[in-house]
A protein has these predicted regions:
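Short, conserved secondary-structure transition motifs
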Residues: 156-163
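A short, conserved, highly charged catalytic patch centered on acidic carboxylates
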Residues: 2-4, 11, 16-21, 25-151, ...
């Protein structure tokens, strides 16, 4: 068993989690993007959607977005793609993650704390929720070994649509909003807020609805 084998909402019972919903990022401002980056992304997004494969969306949309975010934040965070993340194989907390963001800028080795897990899906967001949540639990356990902050964020994205999640303790909170690629500045603003808040050790809580 591995991350990809976890379904949703079955992952809740399998890993002993509770689910909630909240407007996690209400009021987070859009990040100002350069005209050159916006123009380049306009063409790459069109190309990725025309090819319409998970690989194309990952290469032409998701990777450039995360790379530009790292540049805008001064390279203060690590960015890993397609890495094996084996934490506890006995519980299925192992496998490959599409993208991992870490608070450390070190790129030679994956170090705690892992802040964000990003999983790319070609078909629909819901199909990636179980896999993403399992990877978030693995990240939480990985961080705990070095006494790092317990809050982990996850993102499931098709490239054109983005869904954010937060894990704190045994509670997974799903953002009630979905963000679309036309709101790229807002998506990158949320990612920047997650990363900079993690750097300061503060993540603001939002009122939530338990499921």
């Amino acid at each position: 068993m591995a991350f990809r084998d976890f379904g949703f909402p079955e992952v809740q019972q399998t890993l002993g989690l509770t689910l909630a919903e909240a407007d996690l990022f209400r009021g987070v401002p859009a990040l100002e993007l350069s005209p050159a980056f916006s123009e380049r992304m306009h063409g790459d997004i069109a190309l990725a959607l025309a090819i319409n494969t998970e690989k194309a969306r990952s290469e032409f949309i998701i990777a450039p977005v995360l790379s530009e975010l790292r540049r805008l934040l001064g390279g203060r965070f690590g960015l890993f793609s397609g890495v094996e993340f084996d934490v506890d194989a006995s519980r299925g907390l192992n496998g490959y993650c599409d993208f991992i963001l870490t608070r450390s800028p070190l790129q030679s080795v994956l170090t705690a704390p892992v802040v964000t897990i990003v999983e790319a899906k070609n078909d629909n967001l819901r199909s990636g929720l179980g896999q993403c949540i399992a990877a978030m639990v693995a990240a939480q356990e990985f961080n705990a070994k070095s006494s790092s902050p317990a809050i982990v964020h996850g993102v499931v994205t098709t490239g054109s649509a983005w869904k954010f999640l937060r894990l704190e303790g045994a509670e997974v909170t799903l953002d009630v909003e979905e963000y679309f690629i036309a709101e790229l500045g807002r998506i990158m603003g949320i990612l920047a807020q997650i990363l900079t808040a993690a750097e300061m050790g503060t993540i603001a809580a939002r009122p939530r609805l338990n499921l």
